[in-house]
Amino acid sequence: MAGAAVHARGLRKAYGQRVAVDGIDLEVRRGECFGFLGPNGAGKTTTMRMLACLSSRDAGELAVLGMDPDSQPRELKARLGVVPQEINLDLELTVLENMLVYARYFGMRRDDARARALELLRFVDLHERADDTVMKLSGGMQRRLQIARALINEPEMILLDEPTTGLDPQARRLVWERLRDLRAGGTSVVITTHYMDEAERLCDRLVVIDHGVVICQGQPAALVRDRVGAEVLEMRAAPDQAAVLAAAASPRNLVEGDVVMAFGDSAHDMRVRADAAGIAWDLVAERRATLEDLFIVLTGHSLRESSAGGD
């Protein structure tokens, strides 16, 4: 697609015998927030490393901002902002010093770098902590400083790997707010996440990835509506009757021991069909369908169950 922020076809990366990314196709449009949703070990971080010129691909096509990360890393890095999952700040330097040191990598004049740094610290609500050492900041503040630092070169696109992992709810919301501000200003934003609420709140479009393969992509709400339905009915029944109850309630279902999850457009209709099956059951929950349910329908297991291991 002409003018895409990211264009990938058949993208593949392996580490020895382990295939981390297995021939994925994707397009990221300029100015959108695009997400990679999946469990730990799905291939999200490996894909981001290829986009960020930190790891070469084994096969396939990849263009980021119209450039090949493998053959044009210097030019591309000048136009990218990258926020890794781990905190990689200089803890003994002040907040402002961290910004100024990073600006040197882009050849910025000191006066320009200082002005830009102070502007960004205000953007992430850290201007009053400019002279504090980083070790005095909370985890959420350190994450916001990482975002500010990644913006020092006024990038066209920013890549964030699990940007809110380990943060408390208030800190997560502050990060989300700043990412929405960036998107509103025209910056392309690409994130990886295993948090369903984060993907639903931030992403214009996303891919669901598992075991290095893209299993679906599109707008979050549309994916849930088309693949899952509007509502979920969770029931409990005798283990030897749970499968029969599930099939009666909806053709889209999951059985885990004595717990049945039925997916469809109407929880009321699913309850009627469950009652008609003549099997005793208890209601566990009746709720709106989410991206977690989408993942369950597509893979047969939850994101939480899949989250052991690295990426």
Segments predicted by a language model, with ranges:
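Conserved catalytic motifs of ABC-family nucleotide-binding domains
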Residues: 154
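Conserved ABC ATPase signature
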Residues: 133-137
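Conserved ABC ATPase "signature" region
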Residues: 100, 104, 111-129
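Catalytic Walker B motif of ABC-type/P-loop ATPase nucleotide-binding domains
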Residues: 158-161
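ABC transporter nucleotide-binding domain
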Residues: 176-265
